């Protein structure tokens, strides 16, 4: 029984797809356990970029099983489109498995998402308008439609009719918006269900059987800990639990079967959307990091907000997600800066604090306390070991590990597979 969970430790976009792809080489099953197509991950193989939003990164290994777990909310339209994209690129999807218990995103979820966001005005959350939140709302309200329902024509028709009648009343009476047509949705989405039914199964059985047989299973989280609905910067969060604990709920695997948790972070910080960001940069340094790091959302295309590395955030993530190993990405983006900074604590109304407040008004008043380190000018994208890094870059990597309190297992100096450097093998340490 061997399993590793990969979680983002910041606000998403940390490079989880790259690290999952890297760790997938030694895994036999790769599974997603939460989120939906609001999460984008980019994988670079032989210089070619592949951008996925729903299908696990492990799909590029045809001999390995890729699982979309029950905790994921699935937009069948997006899934069919992504499958076609992979097929056009010559990538087989015969190794994909989709949980019959996963909930379905339908057009009324997306419309409701847009209407709710518009109604918030200046208090908007910054949602990707993918229908994720409304789909999880229906799930919690016990009126959601699951993949198993989508495949049964009569059940799908009955539940869609009931749900759509309620949603249309909401659209017309509360939002003065156009109602949606039952027949159009039913025909389109039932057809999508028939296209994906070959992949649908009880994925909890597949995952547990694999673990019981001693196979290596890798769980791939979406978003990041700071977007977790319980542990993140609520309400500026996603609607699921990206923390490692979400694995057990979203995959049907017990907590006693989780061995290691790899926290993925960048050598700086970024986030898409609104919400607190204590170390955010608004100067030319921030603009430089954004441009060099190509900080634009995979899903939205929006410019990401960027800032210095925040060890307060990272220690919070380590604690609530049980992180055992750290993967530090995008060190190369900081090359060329005379000075690099790490936030070590916050100043809250004249008092130093080492924790991340839950109160958003307090967070607004938090001022980062920085430790400054000398930067490095060298191009490090070709570095293949820690010893090859310039001394100042090595010191930066070591200091990050010290402040977070977790050993760094890998560090990356670029987006390619070959640019990920191993300091300690996660699989070998189990």
Swiss-Prot record:
**Which Gene Ontology cellular component terms are annotated?**
cytoplasm
Function, please? Plays an important role in the de novo pathway of purine nucleotide biosynthesis. Catalyzes the first committed step in the biosynthesis of AMP from IMP.
Q: Copy out the cofactor comment.
A: Binds 1 Mg(2+) ion per subunit.
List residues binding IMP. Answer: 13-16, 38-41, 128, 142, 223, 238, 302
Its name, as the record gives it, is: Adenylosuccinate synthetase
> Quick one: which gene encodes this?
purA
What are the binding positions for Mg(2+) in this chain? 13, 40
Q: What is the lineage of its organism?
A: Bacteria, Bacillati, Bacillota, Bacilli, Lactobacillales
Q: Name one GO molecular function term.
A: magnesium ion binding
